[in-house]
Amino acid sequence: MASGVLPRRRSGYTTAVTIGAERFYLTANQRDDGSLGEVFLHWGKHGTSGAGLANSYAIALSAGLAHQVPLADLVRPGIGQFFVPNGHTDDPEIPRVRSAVDYIARRLAIDWLPYPERAALGIYTLTERVQRWERATAFAGARDGYLCRTQTFGSM
């Protein structure tokens, strides 16, 4: 099979997420080797600006993947992009985002990039964030992630 060409039948998944009050659907399909091969985004009604922009972003991501652009290079510019809709999501691994593009970049990174590449982008799973917090608070005087302070009463 030629580079960048996906099999006729391929595995993938669709993630539904609400950002603010808007519902998005992200479909990610993989190549035979298990790497990410193409992305589809659905947002709002067909023909609206949002639907067109989401589709254009998905086409750009998929074209980059077809030309062997590393996924980290494709998602890096989207991380932290700020525009509406933004705010809280119903995805426990990504509870808050600055935009739909920010969410897509983070979700693709979590699902498709190995830990070292995600860590270089500052993207961690919920479990990894908890582990990082526990390591950061595991210093002298810390117990079970909580700071224990000794207070001395007497002369001041």
Segments from the language model and where they lie:
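Generic secondary-structure signature for well-ordered alpha-helical cores
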Residues: S62, A66, G80-V84, R106-P114
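Function-dense linear segments that define catalytic or interfacial modules
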Residues: A16-P77, Q81
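Short beta-alpha connecting loops at secondary-structure transitions
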Residues: L41-K45, P85-I94
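Catalytic or ion-coupling anion/metal-binding cores of large enzyme and transporter domains
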Residues: M1-N29, H88-M156
